[in-house]
């Protein structure tokens, strides 16, 4: 596992030379005129346009959770830099103390449908490495009707979860 300073860079440092980074939301596109309009009212003409629609997580829409309190206690999210760090710290503690680990995914598969499975498997691995596996019950709950939405990989994933005694529940 990498340290935060080994994997994070300011976004501006990641852009190729000659790329103009517009830090605003596109609210209208006119592909015929090759124009984009932003929420801030700017219009851009383009010959070639790359849109990178981001994902905005609205914690205020989840009852009982806010961005500020996420990671306090036992509710964690791996989909942002700060949340991933808090999750790693919590996993270190959990795999030392033991208990019941409940891992979930979402119906929409948020940024990456495989990420929650990786975190569950990482936690299980840590517990084996620490010699605490027998003190932990792992459960993985899926909102959909399968562990993974890529049928080619689902049988092998189910086999791995079974081999590691991780209970899987599908909707």
Language-model-detected regions and their locations in the chain:
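Rossmann-like dinucleotide/flavin-binding elements
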Residues: 61-62, 67-141, 145-148
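Flexible loop residues that form catalytic
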Residues: 41, 54, 106
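Hydrophobic/aromatic beta-strand patches that form the interior of the parallel beta-sheet core
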Residues: 22, 50, 102, 139-141, ...
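N-terminal Rossmann-like dinucleotide/flavin-binding domain of flavoprotein oxidoreductases
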Residues: 1-46, 150-171
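Short hydrophobic core segments
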Residues: 44-56
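Short active-site-adjacent helix-start/loop capping segments
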Residues: 29-31, 45, 58-60, 111-112
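Short, well-ordered coil/turn residues at beta-beta hairpins
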Residues: 39, 52-53, 61
């Amino acid at each position: 596992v990498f340290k935060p300073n080994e994997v994070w860079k300011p976004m501006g440092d990641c852009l190729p030379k000659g790329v103009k980074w517009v830090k605003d939301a596109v609210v209208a596109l006119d592909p015929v005129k090759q124009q984009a309009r932003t929420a801030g009212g700017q219009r851009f003409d383009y010959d070639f346009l790359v849109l990178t629609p981001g994902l905005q997580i609205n914690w205020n829409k989840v009852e009982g959770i806010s961005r500020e309190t996420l990671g306090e206690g036992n509710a964690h999210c791996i989909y942002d830099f700060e949340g991933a760090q808090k999750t790693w710290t919590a996993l270190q503690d959990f795999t030392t103390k033991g208990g019941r680990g409940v891992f979930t995914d979402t119906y929409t598969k948020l940024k990456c449908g495989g990420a929650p499975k990786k975190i569950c498997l990482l936690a299980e691995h840590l517990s084996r490495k620490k010699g605490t596996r027998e003190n932990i019950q792992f459960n993985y709950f899926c909102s959909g009707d399968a562990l993974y939405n890529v049928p080619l990989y689902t049988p092998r994933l189910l086999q791995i979860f079974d081999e590691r005694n991780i209970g899987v529940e599908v909707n």
